[in-house]
């Protein structure tokens, strides 16, 4: 019996530690690797970022979502990293000079250059807003329980312009970067200026 107690004496802390780690990874926090350049220059290809599963989503928040079923080209287990531009119920308008308006209020896009703000397609391909041309003065509304997301590298990003709005139930959490990332401020704490 004392041999059993001895084994359990060192085995129990290991089991407890693994259980705590599993709970943390499942419900609170995990690491995700950025795949591709759609968030350049703020996130780099292969950069490791923290995913907070209980993070609050607001305009400007960078999120990770399960792309399977959102993007027709996504495979099971594909995860996309994008920036939230529109929340459920928001009215989105792009002016022809790349200025972004949400609910009639101009939004800061200081996290990317003026050239990046107007790069990529300006005609929405998504079914919910198909044919709306950004920059033409047309306004569209983000549906209930969905988000409009864009990559920071607008010219190379496969985002809501192509596959539509991201359902709330597909969002895995919010992204945070380490202090060593010189763009950490625009990922961790960006708040669109009014």
Predicted feature locations:
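Alpha-helical transmembrane signal-anchor/signal-peptide segments
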Residues: 30-45
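Hydrophobic membrane-insertion alpha-helices, especially the h-region
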Residues: 9-27
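Soluble "head" domains of membrane/secretory-pathway proteins
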Residues: 3, 7-8, 12, 45-194
């Amino acid at each position: 019996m004392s041999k059993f107690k001895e084994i359990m004496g060192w085995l129990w802390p290991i089991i407890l530690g693994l259980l705590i780690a599993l709970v943390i990874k499942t419900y609170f926090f995990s690491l995700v690797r950025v795949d591709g350049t759609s968030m350049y220059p703020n996130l780099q290809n292969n950069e490791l970022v923290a995913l907070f599963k209980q993070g609050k989503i607001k305009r400007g928040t960078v999120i990770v979502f399960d792309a399977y079923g959102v993007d027709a080209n996504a495979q099971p287990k594909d995860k996309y990293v994008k920036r939230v531009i529109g929340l459920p119920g928001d009215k989105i308008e792009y002016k022809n000079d790349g200025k972004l308006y949400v609910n009639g209020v101009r939004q800061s896009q200081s996290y990317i250059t003026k050239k990046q703000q107007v790069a990529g397609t300006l005609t929405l391909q998504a079914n919910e807003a198909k044919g709306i041309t950004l920059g033409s003065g047309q306004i569209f509304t983000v549906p209930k329980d969905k988000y409009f997301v864009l990559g920071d590298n607008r010219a190379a990003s496969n985002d809501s312009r192509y596959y539509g709005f991201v359902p709330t139930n597909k969002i895995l959490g919010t992204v945070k970067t380490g202090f060593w990332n010189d763009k950490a401020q625009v990922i961790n704490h960006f708040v669109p200026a009014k």
